[in-house]
């Protein structure tokens, strides 16, 4: 509902250009890799993302319809996986890149025997507790286990580069 209101108010208030941020989850679950833009709406969405994806698709289509019907200049952009300042690096809840960065950082500290820094970084009480915790995520002083099959292709974009791209598109 919020995006509908924003898009409609942009039209009513003669906004010169509107940038709508979509999401890569709008593409089908079994889209080919690398993913071409034109595969939108060609197959089933990932079930766990479906409500969010449908809402994003509705926003994209609403912008497209306003452009056709009213001559607006509403553009849609689908950013890829973003990372950067203020990201979530929690090993239990973060996305793939922040988790990988944190795992490598902790493994490096372990390898360099900087145990106080590891304990502090993880907000735990002892190095034994920290090592046991990190082991759950495949991290020790000699290796970092990277989860998954290695088959999915992923793209990452630094958040400040995305911000620059948005400004560029609006100019």
Residue positions per predicted region:
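Conserved Rossmann-fold NAD(P)-dependent oxidoreductase catalytic core, especially the SDR/UDP-sugar
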Residues: 4-50, 75, 88
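Hydrophobic positions on the long internal alpha-helix
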Residues: 2-10, 62-63, 165, 169
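NAD(P)-dependent short-chain dehydrogenase/reductase
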Residues: 32-38, 64-168
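Active-site helix of classical SDR
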Residues: 51, 55-58
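A structural signal for well-ordered alpha-helical scaffolds and beta->alpha junctions
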Residues: 3, 56, 93-97
């Amino acid at each position: 509902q919020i995006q509908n209101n924003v898009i409609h108010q942009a039209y009513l208030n003669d906004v010169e250009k509107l940038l709508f941020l979509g999401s890569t989850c709008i593409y089908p679950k079994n889209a080919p890799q690398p993913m071409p833009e034109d595969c939108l709406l060609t197959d089933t969405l990932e079930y766990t993302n479906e409500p969010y994806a449908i809402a994003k698709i509705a926003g994209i289509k609403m912008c497209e319809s306003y452009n056709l019907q009213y001559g607006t200049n509403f553009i849609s952009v689908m950013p890829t996986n973003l990372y950067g300042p203020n990201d979530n690096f929690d090993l239990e809840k973060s996305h793939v890149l922040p988790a990988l960065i944190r795992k490598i950082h902790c493994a490096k500290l372990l390898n360099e025997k900087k145990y106080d820094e590891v304990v502090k970084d993880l907000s735990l009480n002892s190095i034994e507790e920290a090592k046991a915790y990190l082991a759950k995520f495949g991290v020790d002083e000699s290796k970092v286990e990277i989860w998954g099959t290695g088959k999915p292709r992923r793209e990452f974009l630094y958040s400040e580069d995305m911000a620059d791209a948005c400004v560029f598109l609006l100019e």
